[in-house]
C-alpha cells in the first residue's frame, strides 16, 4: 500500500500498516494559514478527538486532501 505523506508525495507503507489517513484540525493560525494536516500510513484508523477530522481509506494513494484536489 502507498499513502500520501504530503502534497503529491507518497511512500510505500511499512508492513502491517494497511490504512491511509488524513488528519486535519484548526489551530491559532487557521484563519491565515488554513487547517493543519497530517497524512500517512497506519495499522488502524486513528481515533479522532474533539475538533479533529480524520478520514481513512485502504487503496493506493487514496488519502488525498480534498482542498488540494487530485
UniProtKB/Swiss-Prot annotation:
Gene3D superfamilies, sorted: CD59 (2.10.60.10)
Disulphides: 3-20, 13-41, 26-30, 45-56, 57-62
Modified sites of kind Serine amide: 70
Main location: secreted
Keyword Methyltransferase listed: no
Family as reported in the entry's similarity comment: Belongs to the three-finger toxin family. Long-chain subfamily. Type II alpha-neurotoxin sub-subfamily.
Full protein name: Alpha-elapitoxin-Ast2a
Biological source species: Hydrophis stokesii
